Amino acid sequence: MEEDEDQFLLSSLGVTSANPEDLEQKILDEATKKPDNDEGGSVEEKSTQLEGTNLLSSSQNELLNKLRAVKFEIDAVASTVENVDEIAAEKGLKKDDESDLQGLHSGSALQHALATDRLRSLKKRKIQLEKELTGLHGQSASSSADHGNLLRDLVKEKPSLKRKLKEIRKPSRRDGKKVKVVSFREDTDFDAVFDGASAGFVETERDELVRKGILTPFHKLDGFERRLQQPGPSNSRNLPEGDDENEDSSIIDRAVQSMSLAAKARPTTKLLDAEDLPKLEPPTAPFRRLRKLYKTPNSPDNEAKKRKAGKKSKKTRPLPEKKWRKRISREDSSLQGSGDGRRILTTSSCEEEELDDFDDADDNERSSVQLEGGLNIPECIFRKLFDYQRVGVQWLWELHCQRAGGIIGDEMGLGKTIQVLSFLGSLHFSKMYKPSIIICPVTLLRQWRREAQKWYPDFHVEILHDSAQDSGHGKGQGKASESDYDSESSVDSDHEPKSKNTKKWDSLLNRVLNSESGLLITTYEQLRLQGEKLLNIEWGYAVLDEGHRIRNPNSDITLVCKQLQTVHRIIMTGAPIQNKLTELWSLFDFVFPGKLGVLPVFEAEFSVPITVGGYANASPLQVSTAYRCAVVLRDLIMPYLLRRMKADVNAHLTKKTEHVLFCSLTVEQRSTYRAFLASSEVEQIFDGNRNSLYGIDVMRKICNHPDLLEREHSHQNPDYGNPERSGKMKVVAEVLKVWKQQGHRVLLFSQTQQMLDILESFLVANEYSYRRMDGLTPVKQRMALIDEFNNSEDMFVFVLTTKVGGLGTNLTGANRVIIFDPDWNPSNDMQARERAWRIGQKKDVTVYRLITRGTIEEKVYHRQIYKHFLTNKILKNPQQRRFFKARDMKDLFILKDDGDSNASTETSNIFSQLAEEINIVGVQSDKKPESDTQLALHKTAEGSSEQTDVEMTDKTGEAMDEETNILKSLFDAHGIHSAVNHDAIMNANDEEEKMRLEHQASQVAQRAAEALRQSRMLRSRESISVPTWTGRSGCAGAPSSVRRRFGSTVNSRLTQTGDKPSAIKNGISAGLSSGKAPSSAELLNRIRGSREQAIGVGLEQPQSSFPSSSGSSSRVGSLQPEVLIRKICSFVQQKGGSADTTSIVNHFRDIVSFNDKQLFKNLLKEIATLEKDQNRSFWVLKSEYKD
């Protein structure tokens, strides 16, 4: 029924819809059927007639490709297992001898267990594929060795499709580097690994079940897993083997059922196109007003309101109704005056039902479900959790038993808050709870409190924020923002200076700490301001909601968060990884300090090899090394990152349909747009004399409404914001009219407050009931506005800025969403959608995204699609590019001619580009979509898990930007696999050479793992509340000389008040002061220089791009401290654990420069002590470095 309504509405708007999945499948089928066609000039020659060639069937080809990919990963994982075994053998390590849990799990035990399990699964998968192949072509199971010969015959006999040689452009700053020529040809090995790893690294059965929320990453790992105890009087922990098998089969059955339910509930996305586009106007027409002014319809009620208002011209926003404001006030007062807020708190009917469950449970001595190790989950909580949420609670308990933290990276709207609160409540129920702290955006403070009282009413919740204490707070927040766009800093910061009254929060903190169920909720800004108080407390748990806020390892808020005194740290984020490996390191260094070592070592041993391996001119050794380093890194981090998608779990979500509407520019918009493109400002942008963001901002304002350019001078004009001058507003007017008649309720998002002003005037003029929330909305009113909209059917529209409130804002009262203008960052648009389409939504959701055809907005949308193609299901939310290349800039500042009858939207070309990209990875087609209908591709989160992974190749021959290469190299495993096998075939044709390269790559990966182990060892000597050394900030894990230089300065904002040196007591060292010693700057320059030198050398001399263990092969010059200390340690170990000064000096004479002499001494003293006997003196390694 609703689909018919949508079709009728879209027909009235002059647009048509199409199913993107059908279109994509059609294009892929065409590309598969005609693999020998020329597409877009990317292939130079068509394939010749294949006579006398016995080609395998498509199914056999597919199985062969998968088999080859599995074999390649088996080799990589096997080397990791062997490496861990060697380290364990050298140290004589036995699992039973490990008494310190932290030391055990930060060592090699878990990595070895995971790698062994993965190896077992891969071998099982290999046998299965070989059996399938045997059944296909009638060979015996023992003939699997012939598959390699068959593949070589295929490669040999099948004519190769040659591409143009692409010359890598020589950067101006690297004039001395030699130019390499790379030939891109279709190759069976290239296709094999691409097809076999289209979803990332080869997905094992464990990986699939974890992704679908059925198992935890620690399933069946002895010493790590904490299973549900079986009900019954015995309540035994160790189940018989038969029960284990039955459990496995039941898990598989649940997985199949879950997959089928998820497939049925999977939402669809539709592609839309505007018809009857207006003809092109003359190049530059002067901006003009409409002769007919847009005024509010005259009615008796309106006239009465005007007379009542008198001369009052200031427009005030509508406030939530009195009953909703009173509700928030009662919540604040009740929780401040009572330790048990659940008896006083006003609740909704569903919340009252929850409290009744707890009251009944009190009378019956609450029943519970027990996990191994003693965690009791109250039955009233357990039965209300979805299966994947129960797995999440189990995973949190497994981390707790390891005294480690983790990242809950579930997709937005899957209930991360519920999982955390259920776990904390279970800890309290099991008598294991200590007062904990939750840090979140300011808009979510009351939502956290309400959810805590709903899911576990025994919590004593306190909010440390002025908005929850002072009724008058927020009155001074009405000043206009200097920025046109709401940002993270402007939307969710507290906008307040540090309070002069340092004892203001003492009583509140005492109430939390003195309560056995104390739970403190505060914001990131308050944590920074009140660091003296909050950082001196030993918390049970520290939870960061929207934890991607600490992705910058050197920012103040990151360093403050990392000083919280607890080993139990949880990050909640719907966008777990952004762009760089550095951001990955920062998040993991919070939840598991030292897991990835110190940042300089991590960058030198992992980031640089992975980055170099992603370059277009990387050698086979470099590419193979990058892959093996990525394998090591994956096994380190995956158990501590839980990421489930809506498409993979049975989340009981309603259907969601998303439309992308391409709107046409009005006459005024087009003339203004063309006038700007012809202006001197654009010329200055091209010349580099003006910031490009200025021009982009102007064009985006024109797309929204041309009046925004004259806001300061014309906002009082009665005709300001006339919807007839905006193509998108004309569409909004028609859509809202129909939705109002159909009884739907709407969320209307825009990025800017200025555009919200125009939309608000439009809503007032049409007498629509509405509410508004943006960065200037007082914090105390935000929850009341949300409550009113979710519970009052009278509210028709809620207008918001895209970023206000963060990812966790729940607006399920709406079932229609309009995203007025797209964001560079696709996650911002996604989070706007997720406000309505999440757990708790009872109706089907329809989303309209408005994009102005042929303008900057379509290019923004195009780049959103590009980002979705470049990322896999773990890295779902990359940021936009921070800069543009010259050709990108010129591409942005154009307007497509709408007068061309054959013109199409830029987005419609994505499909033809998709087919071209498919050709690059092995299948070819020059057949385009049969119609010239303009198409818009919107890759939603649930849809992209099914999308065909496509390797995006730079057509101009230049390497992609560094961030993209990192993503493709580490997690987009088909990119890694493809590069590995392609280069191996092109540059190393014989098996002996391949084996030699793999051996060398394995050695480099082993050295990287060893460097990380040593770095972790250094880091573990410091308290968990001391920030890890990043090369610029922190001191934990840094060499002693660096620690003296970098650790001597503390953050003045944390220590400038107070009488006692509490900050020094906690080891606070959040950043550098402006008066640092020159030697620190020199050290930083040397680190930067050596890192750049390592990359540069890796490009031209791949086989010497990584530090060798022998001194003779090392380069003379300055070395990174972490590299030098490893060399010293290795040398002394080779000498039996002790060496005299003369031998040490002679060995390092050619390695250490004169400027590094003092650094060398300090590093030597760090790992060894000088001992003397009657005849001589010698350096002896300290005990922790002997093995």
UniProtKB/Swiss-Prot annotation:
Enzyme Commission number(s) from the entry: 3.6.4.-
Chain ranges for the short sequence motif Nuclear localization signal 1 as given in the UniProt record: 162-169
Domain Helicase C-terminal: 730-890
Regulation: induction: Accumulates after genotoxic agents treatment such as bleomycin (BLM), a small peptide that create DNA double strand breaks (DSBs).
Domain Helicase ATP-binding: 397-594
Record-level Gene Ontology MF annotations: ATP binding; DNA binding; helicase activity; hydrolase activity
PANTHER family: DNA EXCISION REPAIR PROTEIN ERCC-6-RELATED (PTHR45629:SF7), SNF2/RAD54 FAMILY MEMBER (PTHR45629)
Protein name: Protein CHROMATIN REMODELING 8
Organism per entry: Arabidopsis thaliana
Source taxonomy: Eukaryota, Viridiplantae, Streptophyta, Embryophyta, Tracheophyta
